[in-house]
UniProtKB/Swiss-Prot annotation:
Subunit (UniProt): Component of the BLOC-one-related complex (BORC) which is composed of BLOC1S1, BLOC1S2, BORCS5, BORCS6, BORCS7, BORCS8, KXD1 and SNAPIN. Interacts with ARL8B, KIF5A, KLC1 and PLEKHM2; links the lysosomal BORC complex to the microtubule plus-end-directed kinesin motor.
Cellular component annotations (GO), alphabetically ordered: axon; BORC complex; cytoplasmic side of lysosomal membrane; lysosome; membrane; plasma membrane; plus-end kinesin complex
Membrane topology category: Lipid-anchor
UniProt organism field: Mus musculus (Mouse)
Post-translational note: Myristoylation at Gly-2 mediates attachment to lysosome membranes.
InterPro entries: TBORCS5
Name of protein: BLOC-1-related complex subunit 5
GO terms for biological process, alphabetical: lysosome localization; nervous system development; organelle transport along microtubule; regulation of endosome size; regulation of lysosome size
Protein's job: As part of the BORC complex may play a role in lysosomes movement and localization at the cell periphery. Associated with the cytosolic face of lysosomes, the BORC complex may recruit ARL8B and couple lysosomes to microtubule plus-end-directed kinesin motor. Thereby, it may indirectly play a role in cell spreading and motility.
Recorded superkingdom: Eukaryota
Family of the protein in this entry: Belongs to the BORCS5 family.
Region (Disordered): 1-31
Amino acid sequence: MGSEQSAEAESRPGDLNASVTPSPAKHRAKMDDIVVVAQGSQASRNVSNDPDVIKLQEIPTFQPLLKGLLSGQTSPTNAKLEKLDSQQVLQLCLRYQDHLHQCAEAVAFDQNALVKRIKEMDLSVETLFCFMQERQKRYAKYAEQIQKVNEMSAILRRIQMGIDQTVPLMERLNSMLPEAERLEPFSMKPERERH
């Protein structure tokens, strides 16, 4: 009985002196710890006929430009870098700088020519715009005069219609008068054209 009490005292969780060691059954099993006892129901696949494996084998292999800078290597090898001649690299950079300078000069020359041409075109367009404005003002005056002529023409047409309605009435009235009191026939033509 005393030994049971001492065993209980050791296994109490509130006791500070009790050493806690997890049992191996409570550990999570890893993939390496699992042992397959029975063969699965799947038929064994032939890896050489797998389309994904065939596609992976068709991918060509690539080598990095600087082999010393592979991700797996901790210290890059400077063997390839040491073979580059610094004078030749400097000459290459200077030639490239000269090429860029020439390109910049060509672009600046073309840009200045374009700016000059744009200014010339602006001046031409402004001159043409002023000329067209003057012309438009002139044509606006002509259009105003034509409008007045159209209004006068409409008035004259109304007068002509009134005369055309009045002349037959005058002739009828004139024919009712005695012979001695009759007027001469009415005519719109000037007197010299009548003779």
